[in-house]
Amino acid sequence: MRIDSDLLDFAIENKLDYTIFRLYAWKPACVSLGRNQKDDFLDRSFLKENNIDVVRRLTGGRALLHADEITYSFICPTLYLKNGEHVVSSYKEISRILIGKFKTIGIDLDFGSNKPIKTGFDYCMLISTGADLCYHGKKLIGSAQCRKQGYILQHGSILYDYDKALLEKIFKEPVSTDEITSIKEINPKLTKEKIIDILSV
């Protein structure tokens, strides 16, 4: 994610008028914390024993486990988007690009609920907002933004698969399969490489 920060600064310094889209995975696995999120819920000893790093994102939101997933970052000038000045509208405008990509492989995504957020959860994927992407009501992609000097950085995590027991150990809260889903659950035949190919076009 340091690269994303550097790319954001590069865009600002060079006054880029186009987008930067990046896909990546993590090795070793890593917990990323939202920009202003407290970290007192983390068991650092457990994470160290299991070779799981911890970083803090530039973007907001809540914590994610980057393990069996694909992370994306999208950088653009605020004025590049039709409604770039409006936070929720800009989330949706960027996310509609992902909706279109996933539709080509038979995965129809929609935006999450606009219900009040349950603020007790530390794990991002357990909270579905109107800017998140869901499959049949279950969250598949969680995203977060930051803004700096007229530019937007949006991060997102696309769940390929997940370890329910590990998530519950890290975040100390029940992970309901009624709340989240994964690419592997939707279509086990889809590989990470296929997803990356589709998103890269």
Question: What function would you assign to each model-found segment?
Answer:
Residues 142-146:
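Non-catalytic, conserved peripheral segments adjacent to functional cores
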Residues 67-69, 128, 153:
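Short, solvent-exposed loop/turn segments at the edges of secondary structure
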Residues 111-135, 139:
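Beta-rich nucleic-acid/ligand-interaction surfaces
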Residues 41-42, 81-87, 166-168, 190-194:
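Short, conserved charged micro-motifs
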Residues 1-45, 49, 53-57, 124, ...:
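Active-site loop/lid in soluble adenylation, ligation, and acyl-transfer enzymes
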Residues 67, 78-81, 87-97, 166:
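Helix-start/capping segments and mature chain N-termini
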Residues 94-117, 149-201:
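Long, positively charged amphipathic alpha-helical accessory segments at protein N-termini or as interdomain linkers
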